[in-house]
Amino acid sequence: MQASQFSAQVLDWYDKYGRKTLPWQIDKTPYKVWLSEVMLQQTQVATVIPYFERFMARFPTVTDLANAPLDEVLHLWTGLGYYARARNLHKAAQQVATLHGGKFPETFEEVAALPGVGRSTAGAILSLSLGKHFPILDGNVKRVLARCYAVSGWPGKKEVENKLWSLSEQVTPAVGVERFNQAMMDLGAMICTRSKPKCSLCPLQNGCIAAANNSWALYPGKKPKQTLPERTGYFLLLQHEDEVLLAQRPPSGLWGGLYCFPQFADEESLRQWLAQRQIAADNLTQLTAFRHTFSHFHLDIVPMWLPVSSFTGCMDEGNALWYNLAQPPSVGLAAPVERLLQQLRTGAPV
C-alpha cells in the first residue's frame, strides 16, 4: 500500500471513529500529553484515566510535580505498576523546573533528554500537543505496521524495529500529523488488537497483507520464550494494634523508593531479625502464600504475621514507619504490600 493512501485512509477513519475526548486531549499541553504518554506505557487507557485525573488535580503544572515529595508521587502511582516510570516522571519534572524554568521543552532533543522519554514518546508529546512533525512507534503502531506490511520478527530486535521506524516515517503525512499519530494509536487499541482484530472494520483492510492472508496472528513476531526464575521472599507483617511496620526500599532496584514489609530470604533469617531485637516470636503465624510475577522473575511471597504489644526494638531502621491501617499515610506501596494491608484491614489474617 502506498504511503499516501495509507495515511489518507487512516485520517478518514479517525475523523469518523477516533478518540477525541480523552482527558489529556482536552486543552492539550505538552505537560498533559507527557504525563499521559508515560502512564500509557504498558498500561491500557481505561486504567490510566483515573490516575491521570488524580495527578492533574494534585499536580496541575510540571512545577507542582517537581516540588512534590517523591513519596507522594509514588503514593498516587500505587497500583499502576512499573514504578520506575513514576520515579523518572518526578526526575524529569525536576529537570524541567531546573533547566527550563518550569516550561515544558518544545524541541525533540530537549524532550528526548528527559528521564524515561525515548524517541517514540518524545515524538508523541510534540506531535500530539504542538502538531510538530515526528513519527511514533508505540506498541499499537508496531502492530498495525507489522500486519499491514507483513514485517516478520520480534520488534524488540533492532533490525525489526528499524524496519518499522522506516515504515512509520514513510506513512506519517506532512499535514495532519497530530490526528494521524492519535489515529494510529487508536487503530491499534480499538481495531488492530492483539487477539481477535476487527479486520472488517479496518480502513486498511484492502491493502493489509496480514488481512489478505488471514495471517494476523503471525505479526508482530512474539518475543522468544524464556523460563522465568523463581525466588522466595518472606514478608514480616509486624502489627501493633492498627499499625504495621513498613520500611522504605532503596531508591533504585526492585520497588525502588516504595514502602514494603521487612523481607527475608527464609524463615530462619526472619526469626534471627526478631531475636536480635528481643521480639518474641511465639505468636508468629504464616499466612497464605502467593506469587507475584515481575518481568524477569517470579517472587513467591510468604507472609508471616506477628502481633506485638509495643514498638520497642522495632524502629532501629531510619527508613521505617508505622503504617496506620485506619489513616494511611501518603506513601508509595508495592502492589503485594497493598494487597496484604487490605487483608489486615478486613480483620484477622488467614
Curated annotation (Swiss-Prot):
<dbReference type="Pfam" id="PF00633">
    <property type="entry name" value="HHH"/>
</dbReference>
<feature type="binding site">
    <location>
        <position position="192"/>
    </location>
    <ligand>
        <name>[4Fe-4S] cluster</name>
    </ligand>
</feature>
<feature type="binding site">
    <location>
        <position position="199"/>
    </location>
    <ligand>
        <name>[4Fe-4S] cluster</name>
    </ligand>
</feature>
<dbReference type="InterPro" id="IPR003265">
    <property type="entry name" value="HhH-GPD_domain"/>
</dbReference>
<dbReference type="GO" id="GO:0035485">
    <property type="term" value="F:adenine/guanine mispair binding"/>
</dbReference>
<dbReference type="InterPro" id="IPR015797">
    <property type="entry name" value="NUDIX_hydrolase-like_dom_sf"/>
</dbReference>
<dbReference type="InterPro" id="IPR003651">
    <property type="entry name" value="Endonuclease3_FeS-loop_motif"/>
</dbReference>
<keyword id="KW-0378">Hydrolase</keyword>
<keyword id="KW-0326">Glycosidase</keyword>
<dbReference type="InterPro" id="IPR011257">
    <property type="entry name" value="DNA_glycosylase"/>
</dbReference>
<dbReference type="Pfam" id="PF00730">
    <property type="entry name" value="HhH-GPD"/>
</dbReference>
<keyword id="KW-0479">Metal-binding</keyword>
<dbReference type="GO" id="GO:0034039">
    <property type="term" value="F:8-oxo-7,8-dihydroguanine DNA N-glycosylase activity"/>
</dbReference>
<keyword id="KW-0411">Iron-sulfur</keyword>
<dbReference type="GO" id="GO:0032357">
    <property type="term" value="F:oxidized purine DNA binding"/>
</dbReference>
<dbReference type="GO" id="GO:0000701">
    <property type="term" value="F:purine-specific mismatch base pair DNA N-glycosylase activity"/>
</dbReference>
<keyword id="KW-0234">DNA repair</keyword>
<protein>
    <recommendedName>
        <fullName>Adenine DNA glycosylase</fullName>
        <ecNumber>3.2.2.31</ecNumber>
    </recommendedName>
</protein>
<feature type="site" description="Transition state stabilizer">
    <location>
        <position position="138"/>
    </location>
</feature>
<dbReference type="Pfam" id="PF14815">
    <property type="entry name" value="NUDIX_4"/>
</dbReference>
<dbReference type="InterPro" id="IPR005760">
    <property type="entry name" value="A/G_AdeGlyc_MutY"/>
</dbReference>
<dbReference type="InterPro" id="IPR000445">
    <property type="entry name" value="HhH_motif"/>
</dbReference>
<feature type="active site" description="Proton donor/acceptor">
    <location>
        <position position="37"/>
    </location>
</feature>
<dbReference type="Pfam" id="PF10576">
    <property type="entry name" value="EndIII_4Fe-2S"/>
</dbReference>
<dbReference type="GO" id="GO:0006284">
    <property type="term" value="P:base-excision repair"/>
</dbReference>
<keyword id="KW-0227">DNA damage</keyword>
<comment type="subunit">
    <text>Monomer.</text>
</comment>
<comment type="similarity">
    <text>Belongs to the Nth/MutY family.</text>
</comment>
<keyword id="KW-0408">Iron</keyword>
<feature type="binding site">
    <location>
        <position position="202"/>
    </location>
    <ligand>
        <name>[4Fe-4S] cluster</name>
    </ligand>
</feature>
<dbReference type="InterPro" id="IPR023170">
    <property type="entry name" value="HhH_base_excis_C"/>
</dbReference>
<dbReference type="InterPro" id="IPR004036">
    <property type="entry name" value="Endonuclease-III-like_CS2"/>
</dbReference>
<dbReference type="InterPro" id="IPR029119">
    <property type="entry name" value="MutY_C"/>
</dbReference>
<dbReference type="InterPro" id="IPR044298">
    <property type="entry name" value="MIG/MutY"/>
</dbReference>
<comment type="function">
    <text>Adenine glycosylase active on G-A mispairs. MutY also corrects error-prone DNA synthesis past GO lesions which are due to the oxidatively damaged form of guanine: 7,8-dihydro-8-oxoguanine (8-oxo-dGTP).</text>
</comment>
<dbReference type="InterPro" id="IPR004035">
    <property type="entry name" value="Endouclease-III_FeS-bd_BS"/>
</dbReference>
<dbReference type="GO" id="GO:0006298">
    <property type="term" value="P:mismatch repair"/>
</dbReference>
<keyword id="KW-0004">4Fe-4S</keyword>
<dbReference type="GO" id="GO:0046872">
    <property type="term" value="F:metal ion binding"/>
</dbReference>
<feature type="binding site">
    <location>
        <position position="208"/>
    </location>
    <ligand>
        <name>[4Fe-4S] cluster</name>
    </ligand>
</feature>
<dbReference type="GO" id="GO:0051539">
    <property type="term" value="F:4 iron, 4 sulfur cluster binding"/>
</dbReference>
